Amino acid sequence: MNDDQYSRAVPFYDLWHEDGHVPEIRESLPPLLKGVRGGVMEIGAGTGLITELIVRETRGEVFAVEPALAMRSVLLSRLAGDAEARRRVTVLACGALDVDVDVPVEAVVMISVLQAFPAGRREELWRVLARQLEPGGLLLFNWRERPAPTPGELELMGSYQVGRHAYEVWGQVLGVSGETVRSRFLYRVRQRGVVIGEDEVTSEAHRPGGERLAAELTAAGFVKDEAPDGLAAWRKAA
């Protein structure tokens, strides 16, 4: 999605993700961060839901990379009320392929971001992240092997009551080509059952298989590490 598309989704973002992958990540990520003493880079920090977790579970500097202004605005507002986060977190207004910090980090965390990168750009992504990591540094991202979805009708994915308004997220798979899934999303606001606001976003997600991912990461100089179901852990070769 581009920045304008993100701005349409932001009011729904925390509501939807708190009802999705975020609670699971709060359980599964901390054990993998337990031994991290140095800096951490978060790719695609979004509104800061996982940034908060990283701050709680680590003690070093945190670089929160978020290119979308709408997401970054919420992220900074979230950090504003936490003195410890304000001291340690640097928010970088760039994308993953453009990030360049002057100190190597001990870990890179990338939650619900991998699907934004088509096969042709992942090679560059792994190269950039390897450059940012210290030798032996840890790369963590969420991933599961899933069957390819099939195109279908528009479906309600979540509805969340906030005061008098219901915030609804609708989704529809439009087409699948290889690892690329093209989808349509509707973000609706209802009051007493009447739609009072609606925005539509069409986007592409890329879902590489496990063998393909392993080959890419191995070629980029990473070695697979242990991780719980739903997460992948790779280390930069020492």
Model region roles, listed by residue range:
Residues 123-135:
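A short glycine-rich, Lys/Arg-flanked "PGG" loop and its adjoining helix->strand segment in the class I
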Residues 49-98:
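Class I SAM-dependent methyltransferase SAM/SAH-binding core
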Residues 206-238:
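C-terminal lobe and adjacent flexible extensions of AdoMet/dcAdoMet transferase-like proteins
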Residues 143-208:
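SAM-dependent methyltransferase
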Residues 136-143:
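Conserved beta-strand signature within the Rossmann-like core of class I S-adenosyl-L-methionine
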Residues 1-46:
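Conserved class I S-adenosyl-L-methionine
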Residues 100-108:
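A short acidic, Gly/Pro-enriched loop at the edge of an enzyme's catalytic core
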